From Swiss-Prot:
Keywords: Ion transport, Membrane, Mitochondrion, Mitochondrion outer membrane, Porin, Transmembrane, Transmembrane beta strand, Transport
GO cellular component: mitochondrial outer membrane; pore complex
Protein name as catalogued: Mitochondrial outer membrane porin
Organism field: Triticum aestivum
One Pfam family per UniProt: Porin_3
Main location: mitochondrion
Compartments where found: Mitochondrion outer membrane
């Protein structure tokens, strides 16, 4: 289905290019599939001297998907998703965590050729209600994102965005943090080169500060991707990602502060196996 998509998708291409898969931790993920369909994913992440783990089970039956996650903090998170249950383009999501009794939430997503609507409400006595929408076409869209805390009767957030897309570029403008910050992002595919570039500029009105991040990625071959980025603080990062088996990836990334070269750089590695 065409259309503007959801509000959360505005500027996502640039963010993925600039931030996705960069890490300084050591992460290992293993996904297995049982004979009758359910998928089980185990993840272990080492952050400095701390190791955290998570195990996830996913079961699909027609248009119903059930995800159950358990982590090393003794939390169990369940998400039930129903696609096209009441009407075409409508997705219903129920999520809750144990033992957090205030974590329950119901979410509705609706995609149309000229609109993408997302509404959610917490399952508590005084819930937070969130409503976001993107309106327009796949080429030009405007959107807004609002959250109301019914306990205080105050807006927890109100944001707005504008997006322009054509065959090889995506540009977006986001007004965030209740109007306190303005972010412009840009994503461009260099024709027939396997290369994409992106940039993100954020201005804070309250502090009058700017932050700029520029990045690029290049497909060396169908199985290998390299990325690099640098920001105005002088932090530079690079990664290489290789698909060594179908759907199995090895990603090595590094970060260095160019203004303090004498400090040791940070290196992260992530291995995702899907045998």
């Amino acid at each position: 289905m065409g259309g503007p998509g959801l509000y959360s998708g505005i500027g996502k291409k640039a963010k993925d290019l600039l931030y996705r898969d960069y890490q300084t931790d050591h992460k290992f993920t293993l996904t297995t599939y049982t004979a009758n369909g359910p998928a089980i994913t185990a993840t272990s992440t080492k952050k400095a001297d701390l190791t955290v783990g998570e195990i996830q089970s996913q079961i699909k039956n027609k248009n119903i998907t059930v995800d159950v996650k358990a982590n090393s903090a003794s939390n169990v998170i369940t998400t039930i998703t129903a696609d096209d249950l009441a009407a075409p383009g409508l997705k219903t999501i129920l999520s809750f965590a144990v033992p957090d009794q205030k974590s329950g939430k119901v979410e509705l997503q609706y995609l149309h050729d000229y609109a993408g609507i997302n509404a959610s409400i917490g399952l508590t006595a005084n819930p937070v209600v969130n409503l976001s929408g993107a309106f327009g076409t796949s080429a030009l869209a405007v959107g807004a994102d609002v959250s109301l805390d019914t306990a205080t009767k105050n807006f927890a957030k109100y944001n707005a965005a504008l997006s322009y897309t054509n065959q090889d570029l995506i540009a977006s403008l986001n007004l965030n943090n209740k109007g306190d910050s303005l972010t412009a992002s840009y994503y461009h595919i260099v024709e027939k080169s396997g290369t994409a570039v992106g940039a993100e500029l954020t201005h804070s009105f309250s502090s009058n500060e700017n932050s700029l991040t520029f990045g690029t990625q290049h497909t060396l071959d169908p199985l290998t991707l390299v990325k690099a980025r640098i920001n105005n603080s002088g932090k530079a990062s690079a990664l290489i990602q290789h698909e060594f088996m179908p759907k199995s990836l090895c990603t090595i990334s590094a970060e260095v502060d160019t203004k303090a070269i004498e400090k040791s750089s940070k290196v992260g590695i992530a291995i995702a196996l899907k045998p």
